[in-house]
């Protein structure tokens, strides 16, 4: 394992969530909050009965039934930052959110290397366009009075030794997300650090998938539970409320 990789993993254990200048009280959930989850197929699948969005919604409803909080899924398969920019008004802003969680970046990287995507003539997102796009979306979201929780991308491959082909680029794009969160005074949820720390601890056989994902990218039940716990922590909701069985939700269309 490289020294750089060790540093990333140690940081992952030490710090996953960083907050804006607002206090924890200000970042806590409030009555009638509307939380939109903006992302790709990981978030689209997160709306399934055992998905991370559904688990998060159920935990919030259980912890704070009196707050009438709505959770809205806005994930679409294959989407990248430019795709999210194009549908931001229809899929996010028109839902009148008070909180928007942006979990994007996997396809922005993966579409540079995935053979099927490359063969089709499609491409990933340049680092510059990734950064500019995140900045633009956050500005529009803040403009309607909503706050942003910006996530770093998770994994494309679960090998814990840093040998997954896209690891270096994912680290680069994650650093961009961290930079954007800081510059826009947004809350950062560093999913990549958390996932790397988990895999370093639980993937002793250096398997390429099966610990947190079904196919090296999309979440299995363990991955969805971890995602939900991390999101709940960012929202200051007790993770003990994560349902083990199929939960009832308070999700909005």
Q: Across the structure, where does each feature detected by a protein language model lie?
A:
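Bacterial N-terminal signal peptides that target proteins for export
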Residues: 1-10
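Alpha-helical cap/lid subdomain in secreted, periplasmic
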Residues: 2, 29-30, 54-70, 82-252
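Bacterial N-terminal signal peptides
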Residues: 10-19
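Boundary at the C-terminal end of the N-terminal hydrophobic targeting segment
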Residues: 22-25
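Catalytic nucleophile-elbow at a beta strand-turn-alpha helix junction centered on a G-D-S/GDSL motif
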Residues: 33-48, 77-80, 109
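Active-site neighborhood of phospho(di)ester-bond hydrolases with catalytic His/Asp-centered motifs
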Residues: 37-39, 73, 103
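Short, solvent-exposed turn/loop segments enriched in Gly/Ser/Thr/Pro and often Arg
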Residues: 74-77, 154
């Amino acid at each position: 394992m490289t020294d750089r990789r060790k540093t990333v993993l140690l940081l992952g254990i030490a710090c996953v969530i960083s907050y804006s200048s607002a206090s924890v009280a200000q970042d806590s959930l409030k009555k009638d909050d509307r939380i939109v989850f903006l992302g790709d197929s990981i978030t689209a699948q997160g709306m399934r009965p055992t998905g991370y969005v559904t688990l998060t919604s159920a935990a919030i409803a259980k912890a704070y039934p009196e707050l009438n909080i709505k959770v809205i899924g806005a994930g679409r398969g294959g989407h990248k930052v430019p795709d999210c920019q194009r549908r931001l008004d229809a899929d996010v802003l028109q839902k009148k959110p008070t909180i928007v969680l942006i979990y994007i970046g996997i396809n922005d990287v993966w579409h540079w290397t995935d053979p099927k995507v490359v063969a089709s003539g499609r491409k990933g997102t340049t680092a510059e366009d990734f950064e500019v796009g995140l900045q633009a979306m956050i500005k529009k979201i803040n403009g309607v009075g909503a706050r942003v929780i910006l996530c770093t991308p998770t994994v494309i491959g679960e090998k814990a030794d840093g040998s997954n082909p896209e690891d270096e680029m994912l680290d680069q794009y994650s650093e961009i997300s961290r930079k954007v969160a800081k510059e826009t005074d947004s809350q950062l949820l560093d999913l990549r650090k958390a996932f790397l720390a988990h895999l370093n601890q639980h993937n002793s056989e250096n398997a390429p998938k099966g610990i947190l994902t079904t196919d090296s990218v999309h979440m299995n039940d363990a991955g969805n539970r971890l995602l939900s716990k991390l999101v709940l922590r960012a929202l200051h909701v007790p993770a003990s409320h994560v349902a083990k069985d199929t939960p009832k939700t308070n999700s909005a269309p």
